[in-house]
């Protein structure tokens, strides 16, 4: 059974996620910051739910606990390789980290598609 404080923290994190997503599409730069914060909050949420300390998670993926703190606060972006390691450690799919974005159907592209042309395998380049 989870400690009551953990449940409160998870509820607070969920509320923070909702507030962040309400700020989506202000600007591309802001979206990147919001994206980083959402991923960090997802990390904090799963860590609390699973009952791990920041130190335990950091040791598992070979980084410092201070880096975990920065990830959770949205101060640093998580490298792809570390997201993969975290996915394995917590036994979650890779898209867990952006689930709130996917669930809210938020998009990144603001340009219209006719301004780009296909290169290969759905990779597009601006005209």
Predicted feature locations:
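Short, charged recognition helix plus adjacent turn
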Residues: 7-12, 99-127
């Amino acid at each position: 059974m989870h400690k009551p404080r953990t449940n409160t923290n998870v509820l607070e994190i969920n509320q923070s996620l909702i507030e962040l997503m309400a700020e989506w599409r202000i600007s591309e730069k802001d979206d990147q910051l919001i994206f980083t914060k959402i991923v960090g909050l997802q990390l904090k949420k799963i860590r609390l739910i699973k009952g791990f300390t920041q130190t335990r998670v950091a040791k598992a993926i070979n980084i410092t606990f201070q880096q975990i703190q920065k990830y959770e606060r949205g101060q640093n972006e998580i490298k792809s390789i570390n997201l993969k390691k975290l996915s394995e450690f917590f036994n979650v799919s890779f898209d867990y980290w952006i689930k709130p974005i996917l669930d809210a159907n938020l998009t990144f592209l603001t340009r219209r598609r006719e301004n780009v042309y296909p290169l290969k395998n759905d990779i597009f380049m601006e005209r």
